[in-house]
Amino acid sequence: YLGGSICREKVTCTGLSVTILDSTVNRFVTRADVEKFLNKEYGNYIGQHIDSIDLCKVEKIIDSRSAVYKSEAFTTRDGKLNVTVTQRTPVVRFQKSDGGFYADAEGYLFPLQSSYASRVQIIDGEIPLKANSGYKGTVTDPHEQAWLNKVLGVVNYMEDSKVWKDKIVQITVCE
């Protein structure tokens, strides 16, 4: 007992509290998903002393998910492991014959999610990106990066224009 409060090293984890900051915009990740990821890859954290929970490991587990932009983990004196998640915000969806993927405004590619489809511009046809449907990360080829940057510029222009945003929902790329 120290200064009117229980010493942190005596407090055990009693549960998980998950906050998805942008859940009204995107629904790629849920509380149940975060709990499942942690149970599978971290192991049992309930009952552990809160000071012994590896918060960096918790964040790495959550951040490794393709639709997660960033997470923050912390514990509180009431024994809760708190995880705050910010999801990636896609601006365009690429649909190829072997599947598809999203790109965010920075050009980060990530797979389509089975649980949720974001309402963004769709581009199909002859897409000159070698990324397959399960790929996550940035484009490394300079020609592919230049093409992707042009596409993102067009999509941003359409999003900023009330006329184009309401009239175009899909773009087909021809050779």
Indicate where each model-derived feature is located:
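Charged, solvent-exposed interaction patches on well-folded alpha/beta domains
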Residues: 1-22, 27-33, 40-49, 53-175
